[in-house]
Every structure is written in structure tokens, then in C-alpha cells.
């Protein structure tokens, strides 16, 4: 663990990554001694309210985390940082974002869980912006200038005050991951969560932790008192939501969208819920131990794209089977008016035979609230996400580039990832194309 005392003693000269979390109320001046080397500065979980004017002297700084501090506005000095491209003000007290306070080279901007009611017109100048996290604010509309953000691939708009979504949003040429649940436009939809069986925390015993995501922690558990209406094994999985708001939106929306999605052979089956003042949780069937995560989450460098262990390999036949299963699952979701919003290898479980299970509806959205044209465009956006998944998997099939199967997958990938949403294939068409090559 890095400490302020060690920083002041000169121990950290020439380091590239610094993390300090000591309830700081003022920016440590000693950090400027690292201006020629520091690339990542993590000052999350402090009590900072401002940055000094000299902050622009951090010439090599690329990544800045100011999560869970007390900022009420974004310091304008950030715009003068020449290499700064990833910025997080998650969980602060931001009520506004002023014009021209962000570096034009920003690629990844996290403003989740603040009180922002409007974005500045200057956000349209962020031509390199790929990832934008805005969930848990008070946005009523998006500035039209954002249609100039042609490199935007992922945007989280959940848990705001949006009444409509602009048509230009669905026409962004690289957009592949979009979430908008928990806005005013979604409140007209009748909740379906009441149809799910409810259980209490006393009905099961938690065991070991299985995993953790943006919205919750998953544990293995065993039924102590299984309701007679539930047909499941004694061993189950329990997803306990972390709080009222996550980076993807409201947990209650995840529950509703998960239920509306219905059952499919490749979806992790949901069997019950816990809804109380103390806790919100989802009860799911336990995934067999032979399944493992297909990929790892994006890194600070890859931004929107998943990462993979160096040892990861797949045959083209396995890739076809996985992508075919995913395309058919997404066909099912969109027929049930649900978009997933988080189509990634790291949310996908597979076994050695390329059998696939898919879950995590934290970024899902109810498409019933959209006009028909936007519903169709939303499918095109998720088709692009499927293309990105295929693009991530193809490099894992080493030395198979010249095979007919590989070339066929390349063509499908290019069709999925094309910029024009009006020319995008449907999931039904993709399923039929892939079946030819099984």
C-alpha cells in the first residue's frame, strides 16, 4: 500500500502509478515531483474538493481516478493536461459540467452517481471519446453536439430523468453497448417483478463467493427451506446487489428485465428473488463447475474491448458454436423486447465443448418504451456488439486464418460491425448464416 508519508520521504521517485487513500482534503504537493513519470493517479476515496492550478504540469498523466471525493464541479485545469484520456469522478457531488473543462483527448469518462442535470455543448468536441458512464444522474436530455462523438462505443444512461432518446444516438457509427433503464421514458412500463417467486434470506445458507460484477456479488448457497413452487437443485447461486445505484443503473430494473427476457437454453435461469428493505437479491440456478468465463473485462488500455489470457485458444468450430448460441439468445431477447447492453466475453460462460451460458442483465433495457424505428436500431447496435465479440474471439484461433470457416466468420463480423445501422443484419439472419458453417 502506498502512503503519503512514503511519498513525502521521496521513496516514490520515477514511479508511473500512484494510489493514495487517506481522507485527503488537499492535493499533496509532493505529487508534482512525479510530473515526468506519473501515468496513473488514483486518489479515490478521499475528501478532495479541488485541484491546484499547477495540475497541468502532469505532462505524462493518462489516467485520473477521483472516485468518491467531494467535487462539486470538474476543475478546468484538466483540459490543459496533454495526455489525460481516462477520468473518473464517480460518486462525487457534481451538479454541473462546465464548458471546455475536459481534455479533447478524453477516451473514457466516468461520471456515474452524481447530480448532473445537463452536459455542456463542448462534449461534442471529444472526438476520441469511446466510453461514457452517466448512470445515476439527473440528465433530462443529451446535447445534440454529442452526435459528433463518432468514436463513442459504450454509453450508460440508466437512472436519469430522460423523457426521450434522440434519433442521432442510435445512428452513432460505432455504438455497441447502450443502457437506458430507470429513466422517465421507462416508467410507463408495467413492472413484471411481482410475477417472480419471493423468498427470504432465512430460506438458504450462503457459502463461498463465486464472483463479483458492477451490480452485485454472487455466492453459492444451499436451500434450507425450498418453496414448493420452485423446481431446482439444492445448490443455487445468489446475486446480492451492492446498493441502490450501480454503474449500470438500478438493481430493480435488472430484476424486471431479467424476468421479461424469459427462458432460453443459453440464459442462466433465474428462479426467485429477495425484496426487502434490507436486501435485494436474485436466486439463480448454479452453473456447473465445468463452465468458465470466456474472457476477462476490458483493461484501462483496451477501454471497451475484453481481454484474454495469453494461453486462451479456440478453434473456428468452437467460435462458430459460441457465436451462434449468442446470436440465437439475442434473437430471443429482442423478440421479448429486451436489449442486453453488455454483450461481452466476460459475461459469457463456456465449457470445453463450447456450450454457452449468458447472463448479467445489469445493463439491460426495456425496448417497449421506444418507437419502432429505435427498437430496430437498438437491435443493430447489439448486432454490432456481437461483431465486436466475434472480432475479439477470432485472434484466438491461431494459424487458422486461411480456412473457409475463418473467412466466413470474417465476412459475418464485417457485416455486423458496419457503421450504417440501416444495413445491419438481424439476429435471425445471422443465426441462419452461422448454421451453414456448423
What are these regions (language model features)?
Residues 207-213, 218:
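Protein kinase glycine-rich loop
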Residues 18, 41-43, 64-66, 87-89, ...:
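Conserved hydrophobic beta-strand positions in leucine-rich repeat
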Residues 217-257:
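ATP-binding glycine-rich loop module of kinase domains
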Amino acid at each position: 500500500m502506498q502512503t503519503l508519508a512514503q511519498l513525502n520521504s521521496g521513496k516514490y521517485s520515477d514511479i508511473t502509478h500512484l494510489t493514495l487513500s487517506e481522507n485527503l482534503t488537499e492535493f499533496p504537493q509532493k505529487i508534482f515531483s512525479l510530473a515526468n513519470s506519473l501515468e496513473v493517479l488514483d486518489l479515490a476515496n478521499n475528501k478532495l474538493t479541488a485541484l491546484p492550478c499547477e495540475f497541468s504540469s502532469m505532462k505524462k498523466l493518462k489516467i485520473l481516478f477521483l472516485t468518491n471525493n467531494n467535487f462539486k464541479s470538474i476543475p478546468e485545469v484538466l483540459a490543459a493536461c496533454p495526455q489525460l484520456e481516462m477520468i473518473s469522478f464517480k460518486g462525487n457531488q457534481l451538479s454541473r459540467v462546465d464548458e471546455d473543462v475536459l481534455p479533447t483527448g478524453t477516451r473514457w469518462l466516468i461520471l456515474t452517481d452524481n447530480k448532473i442535470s445537463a452536459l455542456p455543448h463542448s462534449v461534442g468536441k471529444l472526438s476520441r471519446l469511446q466510453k461514457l458512464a452517466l448512470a445515476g444522474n439527473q440528465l433530462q436530455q443529451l446535447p445534440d453536439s454529442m452526435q459528433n462523438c463518432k468514436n463513442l462505443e459504450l454509453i450508460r444512461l440508466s437512472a436519469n430523468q430522460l423523457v426521450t432518446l434522440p434519433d442521432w444516438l442510435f445512428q452513432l457509427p460505432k455504438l455497441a453497448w447502450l443502457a437506458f433503464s430507470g429513466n422517465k421514458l421507462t416508467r410507463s412500463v408495467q413492472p413484471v417483478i411481482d410475477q417472480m417467486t419471493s423468498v427470504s434470506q432465512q430460506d438458504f445458507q450462503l457459502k463461498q463467493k463465486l464472483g463479483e460484477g458492477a451490480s452485485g456479488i454472487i455466492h453459492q448457497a444451499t436451500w434450507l427451506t425450498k418453496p414448493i413452487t420452485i423446481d431446482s437443485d439444492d445448490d443455487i447461486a445468489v446475486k446480492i446487489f451492492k446498493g441502490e445505484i450501480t454503474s449500470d443503473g438500478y438493481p430493480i430494473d435488472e430484476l424486471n428485465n431479467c424476468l421479461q427476457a424469459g427462458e432460453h437454453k443459453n440464459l442462466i435461469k433465474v428462479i426467485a428473488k429477495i425484496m426487502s428493505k434490507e436486501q435485494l437479491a436474485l436466486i439463480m440456478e448454479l452453473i456447473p463447475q465445468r463452465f468458465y468465463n470466456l474472457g476477462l473485462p476490458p483493461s484501462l488500455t483496451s477501454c471497451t474491448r475484453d481481454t484474454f489470457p495469453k494461453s486462451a485458444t479456440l478453434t473456428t468450430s468452437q467460435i462458430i458454436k459460441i457465436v451462434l448460441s449468442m446470436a440465437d439468445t439475442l434473437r430471443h431477447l429482442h423478440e421479448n423486447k429486451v436489449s442486453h447492453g453488455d454483450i461481452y466475453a466476460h459475461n459469457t460462460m463456456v465449457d470445453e465443448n463450447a456450450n454457452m451460458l449468458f447472463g448479467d442483465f445489469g445493463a439491460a433495457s426495456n425496448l417497449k418504451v421506444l418507437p419502432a424505428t429505435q427498437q430496430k436500431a437498438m437491435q443493430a447496435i447489439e448486432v454490432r456488439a456481437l461483431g465486436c465479440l466475434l472480432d475479439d474471439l477470432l485472434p484466438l484461433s491461431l494459424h487458422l486464418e486461411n480456412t473457409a470457416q475463418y473467412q466466413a466468420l470474417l465476412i459475418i463480423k464485417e457485416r455486423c460491425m458496419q457503421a450504417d445501422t440501416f444495413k445491419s443484419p438481424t439476429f435471425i439472419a445471422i443465426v441462419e448464416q452461422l448454421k451453414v458453417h456448423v
